[in-house]
């Protein structure tokens, strides 16, 4: 019996194993890896205390970014993306402006999203094909940056102006129409003397991206994709709204009159507690905020590699 060539045995096993993953087993060689770079554009949106439906069309804002994909085999693709967009929510999309009990809160924020994820391809990739459709799902981890702002409207006749007194409220006269950053104002009493245990929320947070889409191979090098990805966050403060009201005087004494003015913008000031001593809620702390991104991707494949036999 002749001597067995280990090199060719290993090579044959590799080829047989790879061919079992290929829908067309009659083809011996195929490309098994690729690196792609491209653009992603679409719309970002927010869902939280200031929206009543998850897909609130008025919250959709343009989003743009870059994406890279690396496919080491056929069924899994690893991706990195960086995107910029905006999110927004407003009570006055839903509230009757004549309602004296309306909350009248609003916000908008720039949004930076950095995501690393794994795509699971439901069709096996074969880069020899000039065209084809590949459904996929993805999950990973995202780091996002946000900074909620709201527009201050100077109104000496407002309830908060009357409550604070004109000498104090008039300090804000030259800031009418200004878009004010809300996190530094601690609008829910964070780190005040009375609520020192409530810490300010961080403007950089982590989320879990979950989504899916379709990739359309246009030719050997270009791929068009359509997808939606939900970001499950661990914060309820994307909109600066989460828990309870705080007495405006307390806020004004600790952080200035702007904090009081932006914390309660209703037509009738809300007390810290109701008649039964229960907290007056400004938001719903039991549910975290969410955001999502609808995207269209266009990527260019730089290279693909064929499997090689090991060298001994």
Mark where each language-model region is.
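Predominantly the C-terminal beta-signal and adjacent terminal strand-loop region
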Residues: 219-312
């Amino acid at each position: 019996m002749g001597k067995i060539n280990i090199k060719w045995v290993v090579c044959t096993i590799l080829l047989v194993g790879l061919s079992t993953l290929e829908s067309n087993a009659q083809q011996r060689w195929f490309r098994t890896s690729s690196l792609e770079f491209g653009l992603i554009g679409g719309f970002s949106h927010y869902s939280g205390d200031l929206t009543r439906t998850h897909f609130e069309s008025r919250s959709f804002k343009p989003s743009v970014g870059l994406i890279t994909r690396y496919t080491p085999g056929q069924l899994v693709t690893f991706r990195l993306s960086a995107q910029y967009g905006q999110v927004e929510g407003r009570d006055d999309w839903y509230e009757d402006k004549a309602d004296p009990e309306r909350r009248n809160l609003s916000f908008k924020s720039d949004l930076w999203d950095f995501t690393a994820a794994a795509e699971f391809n439901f069709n096996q990739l074969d880069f020899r094909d000039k065209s084809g459709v590949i459904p996929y799902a993805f999950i990973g981890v995202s780091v996002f940056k946000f900074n909620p702002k709201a527009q201050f409207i100077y109104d000496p006749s407002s309830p908060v102006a009357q409550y604070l007194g004109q000498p104090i409220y008039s300090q804000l006269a030259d800031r009418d129409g200004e878009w004010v950053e809300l996190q530094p104002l601690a609008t829910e009493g964070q780190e005040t003397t009375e609520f020192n245990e409530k810490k300010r929320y961080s403007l950089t947070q982590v989320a879990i991206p979950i989504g899916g889409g379709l990739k359309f191979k246009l030719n050997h090098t270009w791929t068009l994709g359509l997808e939606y990805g939900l970001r499950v966050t661990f914060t309820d403060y994307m909109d600066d709204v989460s828990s309870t009201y705080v007495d405006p005087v307390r806020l004004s004494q600790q952080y200035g009159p702007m904090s009081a003015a932006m914390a309660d913008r209703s037509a009738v000031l809300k007390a810290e507690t109701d008649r039964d001593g229960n907290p007056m809620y400004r938001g719903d702390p039991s549910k975290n905020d969410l955001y999502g991104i609808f995207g269209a991707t266009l990527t260019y494949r730089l290279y693909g590699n064929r499997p090689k036999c090991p060298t001994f």
